[in-house]
Structures are given as C-alpha cells and as structure tokens.
C-alpha cells in the first residue's frame, strides 16, 4: 500500500518513521511481507527486515501503477519464486520499467500502460547487467 492506504489498514501515523516502525511491527505480528510504496519503496519481511528500493521515480505515482506492481509480484510467485525474492525483484523491475518509461517520454506523463510496456526492457537491462 501507499502511505494513505497503509494508514487506513493499520491506523494513522504522524511521520514516515512512525509508519515504517508500524509496518515492521505488523509484518512481524502477522508474518507477512509488506510493500510500502513511496519515493523509496520499502519491503518489510516477516522477520522485520527492511529493504529500500533504489529504482523508480515520482511519475510512477499514477493510477494503476500499484495494480501493475501487484501483477508483477504475483506473476513472479506463479513462476515459482519464493515470496521475499518475488517482492524484491518485482519492486525493483517495476521501478526500472518506470525509469525506462520516463526516459522514453517524461516522468510527468507516465501511465500504468507506459510502465507495462517497459517491463520487457527492464528484464533485458537486468539480464545484461554485470557486476
């Protein structure tokens, strides 16, 4: 969820720090993975580990973007990925696809369809990456 959705689910938080701590608490209590969407999307594991994503941009705060992310993560689960790696890879690829969409046009005009259209290129870029 994004911050407003999270607050509706788990109660209002006055700061992002408070929200992150509440997300850790909820992930541990309910043994769930929480993907807290935002400028640096956080993935919180059932053990309370917090991982921050480095890909993505402000233009991705658009209708349908979260649905696209959910579809990407569930698609990875359907392929046999374990839940935590599926969340991490899904969030990163989603952000990378958004970055590619922004490079192609402009982050001010990104739609969910633009993100979807760049998923293949994001995979290709990731496969070609060398450490």
Description of each model-found segment:
Residues 51-64:
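Short pre-catalytic strand/loop immediately N-terminal to key active-site residues, enriched for Gly-Thr
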Residues 40, 58, 66-69, 73, ...:
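Gly/Ser/Thr-rich beta-alpha loop segments that engage phosphate groups in nucleotides
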Residues 19-27, 83-97, 112-120:
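Short, well-structured alpha-helical segments that form the helix of a local strand-helix-strand
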Residues 8, 62-93:
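Short, small-residue alpha-helix embedded
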Residues 11-16, 58-59, 104-106:
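Short glycine-enriched, charge-decorated loop/helix-capping segments at active-site entrances
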Residues 98-131:
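Charged C-terminal helix
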């Amino acid at each position: 969820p994004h911050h407003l959705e999270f607050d509706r689910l788990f109660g209002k938080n006055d700061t992002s720090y408070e929200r992150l701590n509440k997300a850790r608490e909820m992930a541990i209590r309910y043994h769930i993975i929480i993907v807290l969407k935002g400028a640096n999307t956080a993935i919180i594991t059932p053990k309370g580990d917090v991982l921050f994503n480095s890909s993505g941009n402000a233009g991705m705060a658009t209708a349908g973007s979260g649905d696209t992310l959910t579809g990407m993560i569930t698609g990875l689960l359907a392929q046999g990925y374990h839940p935590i790696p599926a969340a991490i890879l899904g969030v990163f690829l989603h952000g990378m696809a958004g970055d590619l969409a922004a490079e192609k046009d402009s982050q001010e005009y990104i739609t969910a369809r633009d993100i979807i259209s760049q998923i293949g290129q994001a995979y290709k870029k990731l496969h070609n990456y060398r450490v």
